[in-house]
Amino acid sequence: MKQLFRQWYDLSEIKKELTTRNWFPATSGNISIKVSHEPLTFLITASGKDKTKTTPDDFLLVDHVGVPVLETELRPSAETILHTHIYNNTNAGCVLHVHTTDNNVITNLYSDAVTLQNQEIIKALDIWEEGATIHIPIIENHAHIPTLGENFRKHIQGDSGAVLIRNHGITVWGRDSFDAKKRLEAYEFLFQFHIKLLSIQGGVSNGANSYS
């Protein structure tokens, strides 16, 4: 029980911090944190809640397939399947899914992935080589959630990572809440920098507006 309360507090603090950055506009986004490994349970944001508010109904505890563990009238977020795929296939401890203007713009500039390189902040992703290059996959935003989940699952390759969904934000996961938040901050910095650089350079040679 102590672990549940501890993780609840941790997730609530993350929600507050991301809210101050306006990363949950119009009730969008969802976040989760693992509570137990065996059996697998995790806390996830309840669907349709105003994340700028803090209430006792912010989160609910679900099992390995996203079904509430305790009787509740709350519904887990629609994209809970993405979280279950991550927790069932990795040792990740926290998953953050947010919609920002920058991460949506990026998915309108590129097709299957965005490549970013030679930025110091890439070290926040535990990539230390000089001039490092990263590739962030972009998948289509299928309205059929099982199809979205299956396409997402193909890009889960470790205990930390990120996947962009076209016009539907980014999902980032990490070993724990600190690691996941650090990675999300790094990706959002990289997106913002890349978009500003393109605006100065006059756009991309191929791909700009191709997916808008």
Curated annotation (Swiss-Prot):
GO terms for cellular component: cytoplasm. Homotetramer. The keyword Cell division does not apply. Keywords: Amino-acid biosynthesis, Lyase, Metal-binding, Methionine biosynthesis, Zinc. Pathway: Amino-acid biosynthesis; L-methionine biosynthesis via salvage pathway; L-methionine from S-methyl-5-thio-alpha-D-ribose 1-phosphate: step 2/6. Binds 1 zinc ion per subunit. It comes from Bacillus cereus (strain ATCC 14579 / DSM 31 / CCUG 7414 / JCM 2152 / NBRC 15305 / NCIMB 9373 / NCTC 2599 / NRRL B-3711). NCBIfam families: PRK06754.1, salvage_mtnB. Pfam families: Aldolase_II. One of its GO terms (biological process) is L-methionine salvage from methylthioadenosine. It is an enzyme of class 4 (lyase). Zn(2+) binds at residues 97, 99. Catalyzes the dehydration of methylthioribulose-1-phosphate (MTRu-1-P) into 2,3-diketo-5-methylthiopentyl-1-phosphate (DK-MTP-1-P). InterPro entries: Aldolase_II/adducin_N, Aldolase_II/adducin_N_sf, MethylthioRu-1-P_deHdtase_MtnB. Its cofactor is Zn(2+). It catalyses: 5-(methylsulfanyl)-D-ribulose 1-phosphate = 5-methylsulfanyl-2,3-dioxopentyl phosphate + H2O. Its EC number is 4.2.1.109. GO terms for molecular function: methylthioribulose 1-phosphate dehydratase activity; zinc ion binding. The keyword tRNA processing does not apply. Belongs to the aldolase class II family. MtnB subfamily. This is Methylthioribulose-1-phosphate dehydratase.
